[in-house]
């Protein structure tokens, strides 16, 4: 019976993603352990350390489908050990006593850590794929609206005109940096570890480094220079990349949320058939998807707090902190996977960009949004600081008197002869003061597109749990 929100049928899978849930499922985790054991045995056989028939037999039976996961869980509670039940089951499946060669010369954390890196690699490709999809949708939006004027807001207040396309291009540029980080970090993160009980490779003997190198190479991983049982920076880096990307997408969602506020109403989520905003207010159209994305972003970040605690390992290995990873890391990836899927789905369905409302909002302050432009036009006559003082004074008077900025400027005796009415009308045209916004959209669009390593997601196991989830939130208020 599901009790965690990532498995909840009531929430319609809103907090999870089938692909990421499959990667971090019990079945896939155990299969990764078996894959590592199989690769180790194959290498040891090639090097003459164990019989070839033992390696072949281990490979023949190393399938999670042959194991009873519930039984493994019960035995894990009895033994107090997470891997021993799997090792015993694998040994029992091997014929002719060849199971004696299972797990030869390594320790539990070798198998679990290397298996975890294999899971992270599977997820890595999906993350990059989703980010690229999101980037593509946003870039299309940025180019479409690179000349669409709107209010730029600083400290929550109207500041200057900008364009909606430029706002979106800033998001694209940020996502590109995340993709670059994923590319740069790939080689550092995709490193296994088969260094034995205390990291010295004593159990693998004089050929230990070669056994480790060959085994990890067969799994598509690099070998470490030293044990990382207690050095969790690779796990932290993988998690932190997701936290950063999730923070960006959470910020994008939060921006859409506020732009959809009734008083602003410049951007709306696409409306879906059957969507209900409120159980008691029939008119409501709540931003339910960006609601969820924003919440997921915070949940991803919350798991990072636990993972940093897991980095405080004592001595050569420490279960008191290592166990934190077992809970926090899968949740972080699953929440992030849900967030990425929801954002891509939102953009694929299309945002409603309300250009007329953007234009009318530019006029809400009666021209005051162009105060900088007026000040800079005055500066050659009287100096920038004096111009700032004059325009600031006139702007405050206009707001207090409730008159438009144009009339206040024309009526101020200090500015007599400075501007004709036509010149002032031109200066106060918000569509003509968006700076180089459109050009910068083109710069973002034409720069070299990041190529992130691991962008081809490896095949994941058949989706488990609720596979009928929507890409959108299903909850109203």
Please give the residue ranges for each predicted region.
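Short, well-ordered beta-strand elements within core beta-sheets of diverse protein domains
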Residues: 166, 236-244, 373-381
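Glycine-rich anion/phosphate-binding loop at the beta-strand->alpha-helix junction
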Residues: 178, 196, 228-322, 326
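Long, amphipathic alpha-helical stalk/connector segments used for oligomerization, subunit docking
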Residues: 292, 299-385
């Amino acid at each position: 019976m599901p009790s965690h929100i990532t498995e909840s049928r009531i929430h319609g899978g809103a907090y999870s993603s089938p692909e990421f849930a499959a990667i971090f499922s019990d079945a896939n985790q155990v299969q990764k352990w078996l894959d590592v054991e199989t690769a180790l045995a194959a290498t040891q056989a090639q090097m003459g350390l164990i019989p070839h028939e033992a390696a072949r037999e281990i490979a023949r039976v190393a399938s999670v489908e042959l194991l009873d996961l519930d039984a493994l869980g019960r035995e894990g509670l009895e033994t107090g050990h997470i891997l021993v039940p799997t090792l015993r089951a694998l040994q029992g499946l091997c014929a002719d006593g060849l199971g004696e060669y299972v797990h030869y010369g390594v320790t539990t954390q070798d198998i679990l850590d290397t298996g975890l890196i294999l899971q992270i690699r599977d997820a890595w490709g999906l993350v990059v794929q989703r980010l690229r999809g999101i980037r593509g949708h946003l870039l299309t939006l940025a180019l479409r609206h690179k000349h669409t004027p709107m209010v730029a807001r600083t400290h929550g207040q109207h500041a200057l005109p900008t364009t909606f396309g430029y706002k979106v291009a800033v998001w694209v540029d940020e996502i590109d940096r995340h993709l670059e980080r994923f590319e740069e970090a790939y080689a550092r993160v995709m490193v296994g570890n088969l260094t034995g009980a205390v990291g010295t490779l004593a159990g693998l003997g004089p050929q230990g480094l070669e056994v480790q190198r060959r085994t990890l190479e067969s799994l598509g991983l690099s070998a470490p220079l030293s044990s990382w049982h207690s050095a969790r920076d690779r796990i932290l880096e993988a998690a932190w990349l997701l936290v950063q990307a999730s923070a960006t997408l959470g910020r994008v969602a939060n921006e859409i949320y506020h732009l959809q506020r009734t008083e602003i109403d410049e951007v709306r989520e696409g409306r879906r058939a059957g969507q209900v905003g409120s159980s008691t207010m029939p008119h409501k159209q709540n931003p339910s998807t960006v609601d969820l994305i924003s919440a997921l972003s915070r949940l991803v970040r919350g798991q990072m707090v636990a993972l940093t605690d897991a980095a405080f390992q004592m001595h050569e290995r420490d279960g008191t902190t290592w166990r934190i990873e077992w809970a926090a890391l899968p949740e972080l990836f699953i929440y992030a996977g849900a967030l990425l899927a929801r954002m891509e789905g939102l953009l694929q369905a299309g945002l409603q960009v309300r250009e007329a409302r953007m234009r009318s909002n530019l006029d809400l302050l009666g021209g005051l949004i162009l105060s900088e432009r007026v000040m800079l036009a005055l500066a050659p006559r009287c100096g920038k600081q004096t111009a700032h003082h004059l325009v600031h004074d006139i702007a405050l008077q206009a707001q207090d008197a409730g008159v438009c900025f144009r009339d206040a400027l024309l009526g101020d005796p200090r500015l007599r002869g400075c501007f004709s009415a036509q010149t002032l009308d031109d200066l106060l045209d918000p569509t003509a003061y968006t700076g180089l916004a459109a050009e910068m959209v083109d710069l973002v669009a034409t720069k070299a597109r990041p190529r992130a390593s691991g962008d081809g997601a490896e095949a994941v196991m058949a989706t488990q749990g609720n596979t009928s989830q929507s890409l959108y939130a299903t909850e109203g208020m």
